[in-house]
Curated annotation (Swiss-Prot):
GO cellular component: mitochondrial matrix; mitochondrion
EC annotation from Swiss-Prot or TrEMBL: 1.5.1.2
Record PTM Phosphoserine, positions in chain: S278, S301
Molecular-function GO terms, alphabetical: identical protein binding; pyrroline-5-carboxylate reductase activity
Species: Homo sapiens (Human)
Residues that bind L-proline: E164, A237, T238
Reactions performed catalytically: L-proline + NADP(+) = (S)-1-pyrroline-5-carboxylate + NADPH + 2 H(+); L-proline + NAD(+) = (S)-1-pyrroline-5-carboxylate + NADH + 2 H(+)
Pathway note: Amino-acid biosynthesis; L-proline biosynthesis; L-proline from L-glutamate 5-semialdehyde: step 1/1
Protein name, as recorded: Pyrroline-5-carboxylate reductase 1, mitochondrial
Amino acid sequence: MSVGFIGAGQLAFALAKGFTAAGVLAAHKIMASSPDMDLATVSALRKMGVKLTPHNKETVQHSDVLFLAVKPHIIPFILDEIGADIEDRHIVVSCAAGVTISSIEKKLSAFRPAPRVIRCMTNTPVVVREGATVYATGTHAQVEDGRLMEQLLSSVGFCTEVEEDLIDAVTGLSGSGPAYAFTALDALADGGVKMGLPRRLAVRLGAQALLGAAKMLLHSEQHPGQLKDNVSSPGGATIHALHVLESGGFRSLLINAVEASCIRTRELQSMADQEQVSPAAIKKTILDKVKLDSPAGTALSPSGHTKLLPRSLAPAGKD
């Protein structure tokens, strides 16, 4: 089995590193494509031994399982580009927030009947094999496709199948969750520094506290509220600290953050379904394509428009 990534950003890097670290895939069995071969993640993938290409079609031809690891607004462009290259063997896995299975199936069905599509939502801790992933299978995906997906993604953390209509909520919770945790850790470390701790030690202690708390919860059958109560002695330091968090609306802020992420995911879904893309997104997509498709005698001007090079500067031997 070979795996391809359309997109060579943080998610592709995290999954590729997780798969190779888990031993489920050798690096030479992975290929990723990106129009920008100067990305830091591209360099990191290359050092791992992953094959890199600027051409999406090459990645499709190399792959059995194809991950669409690009921003939601790019998906319609990608499907139009690679649709004709999708074959019966391909399992197309979308990692794009808000992009529905039906919208992908509709696009691909214009090129080939019964495309095998899976939608997943994962997160970047897959890079250390502690990811949280859910997936939903499409109309034409086979039972074995779901099993293969679970085998792959269980190697890099927790993975389970859900109904597709739950994936937006998962995006708000665990998809965006690492960012909430990093923000909390940054603030905890600032608190430690304010009270006199060296920065490095403060970050390490905060991270270990959250890691330990998460493991305690996962290894017990107790409600998180009960575990919180177990730490809070009457009149002690912890209950006073919790009072400050409650006064600041800590719980409500987290609930609202999950809700905001979920709502934005649904907005992205609506935009993708209607193929509505912001002007800035269109400009970036076009510029990326121009970089790949420009003939040798053209160059990008500072404004982002293509301009013809003077004949004296064009490569020799081309009229």
